[in-house]
């Protein structure tokens, strides 16, 4: 079975993870850190804004079921790519909108995805395309957060359901049947 990986940063990784784990063809979503200068960063370090890392998700997907372009379209529809270094009340470079292509084809697709999404937003897209770098999985308690603690977390309850509603409205045909 062919599997590919996509790494996307779009604000809080709990919120982004909840969206992508709902998609058919996505085998796994892991929260983590990428794009910084500190080896093995902790959540506390990344939240401090001094490591250069973004909170991101690493998506493992079946390209025969869902394409990288489809993932990018969902990504741009379910976060605000016009906000520089923030998503809502989450402010700092760790919450930046960034794509970390894993190969040249993904870089080309990311550029095209930004161009496609530009028509859907009233302000310029500030999403960056950053070089692939070392991926650091977040601590275990951050993984599949929405499925557990997230549904008791007031922040998540305010942010994630509207993202999931956008996903259901715009990408119903891409949702998991289970």
Q: What kind of region is each of these model predictions?
A:
Residues 1-178:
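Flexible coil/turn and secondary-structure edge motifs
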